[in-house]
Design a protein with these regions (language model features):
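Non-transmembrane "mature" sequence context
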Residues: 1-112
Length: 112
C-alpha cells in the first residue's frame, strides 16, 4: 500500500533523475530501504521522511532552473556557496536550508 511519502520518493526519482543511491544518501536510508519505498512495500518515516520531503522541495525547484538530467550532477558537485560541500550531503545532514538559499540565487538568475 503506497503512502504519500513513498509516492514522493518515486516522484523525485522520476522528475529529478536521481538514483537509488542518491535518494539513500540524501535521506540517510540504506539502498534496500529506498528500493522498498519505490516498490510501495515500506514508507519513509521519522528523519527519513523529513529528508525526503526536503529533497522533494528542492528537486521540484531545481527542475525549473536547469535541465532535469543535470539535477543529479548538480546534487553531487561540491558547491562553493556551500563551502564546497555537496548538496546531497548537506541535505542528509538536515541543513537543506543552506541548499535552498543557493537555489534561490539560481532562481533569481534564471538558470545554471
Amino acid at each position: 500500500m503506497a503512502t504519500s511519502f513513498a509516492s514522493e520518493a518515486a516522484h523525485i526519482r522520476e522528475i529529478g533523475h536521481l538514483s537509488v543511491p542518491d535518494l539513500a544518501r540524501a535521506t540517510g536510508a540504506n539502498e534496500t530501504t529506498v528500493r522498498a519505498w519505490l516498490r510501495d512495500e515500506r514508507s519513509p518515516s521519522g528523519g527519513h521522511a523529513e529528508r525526503l520531503a526536503e529533497l522533494s522541495s528542492l528537486v521540484e525547484r531545481l527542475v525549473r532552473v536547469m535541465e532535469p538530467a543535470y539535477v543529479p550532477v548538480w546534487m553531487r558537485k561540491p558547491i562553493p556557496l556551500l563551502d564546497d560541500d555537496k548538496p546531497l550531503d548537506v541535505i542528509a545532514a538536515g541543513e537543506y536550508r543552506r541548499v535552498s538559499k543557493v537555489l534561490a540565487g539560481l532562481e533569481a538568475s534564471g538558470a545554471v
